[in-house]
Amino acid sequence: MKIALGIEYNGKNYFGWQRQEKVHSVQAELEKALSFVANEKIEVFCAGRTDSGVHGTGQVVHFETNAIRPEKAWAFGTNANLPDDIAVRWAKEVPDDFHARFSATARRYRYVLYCNKLRSAILPYGITHTHLDLDEHKMQEAGRFLLGENDFSSFRAAQCQSNTPWRNIHHLNVIRRGNFVIVDIKANAFVHHMVRNIVGSLMEVGCGNQPPEWIEWLLAQKNRKLAAPTAKAEGLYLVQVTYPEHFELPQMPLGPLFLADEL
């Protein structure tokens, strides 16, 4: 049988999602817990491999198993064997043609900035603190230049292994909630560090160092060296993965928990 899971995790203590030799990863912890519940070795496949320090509230994985368990056992049983910073949010049996990565039609991220002269002791790791006074309206205006299908070479990490820099951004919204500025971005897929590189450059616009039209110019240059530094990992969340409706996967609040679902 094939099972899909919705996964939430705090990426602070992990060297990214992907299982690797001699480093702590979310995938390795999840596979260990699932293998215990299934009483056999389990390998999971995810919708998106997040980097070191990046969080997830809407990660989706699938795995195949010979073990027959009710859906609630995959959720509650696995959670009982996971560390506190990883949790299963839902479990569902899926058809054989489902694949967490290749069946996905879109991914959605939220980047959370805490704008204050002084740092927070309550939320030190799930946000990116900045002393800059960001203008979310200018950031929103700049973001519209990135909508649609474009070559995102200017926002692509040098080590990116994707065959193409072309991606299609469905929406990019910048919202303020008190001292929090949230960049909410959805696309068919993302090149390596794309969200963090976009956020870093939007911050240059938000603080007044660059005009909104600078983002349009950057996009046209197709040169990563001209853009702003990459924003820190700690403020980034994978909040949603979209699939065709016929798979009937559960819909959960996007999160993170301290933000309203709809922004």
Curated annotation (Swiss-Prot):
Positions with a binding annotation for substrate: 109
Listed Pfam families: PseudoU_synth_1
Keywords per UniProt: Isomerase, tRNA processing
Intrachain disulfide bonds: none
GO molecular function: RNA binding; tRNA pseudouridine(38-40) synthase activity
Entry EC number(s): 5.4.99.12
CDD domains xrefs: PseudoU_synth_EcTruA
Annotated active site: 51
Top-rank EC class of the record's enzyme: isomerase
One of the GO BP terms on file: tRNA pseudouridine synthesis
Known catalytic reactions: uridine(38/39/40) in tRNA = pseudouridine(38/39/40) in tRNA
InterPro entries per the UniProt record, alphabetical: PsdUridine_synth_cat_dom_sf (IPR020103), PsdUridine_synth_TruA (IPR001406), PsdUridine_synth_TruA_a/b_dom (IPR020097), PsdUridine_synth_TruA_C (IPR020095), TruA/RsuA/RluB/E/F_N (IPR020094)
Highest taxon of source: Bacteria
Function: Formation of pseudouridine at positions 38, 39 and 40 in the anticodon stem and loop of transfer RNAs.
Subunit structure: Homodimer.
Family: Belongs to the tRNA pseudouridine synthase TruA family.
Protein name per the record: tRNA pseudouridine synthase A
Organism: Mannheimia succiniciproducens (strain KCTC 0769BP / MBEL55E)
Gene from which the chain derives: truA
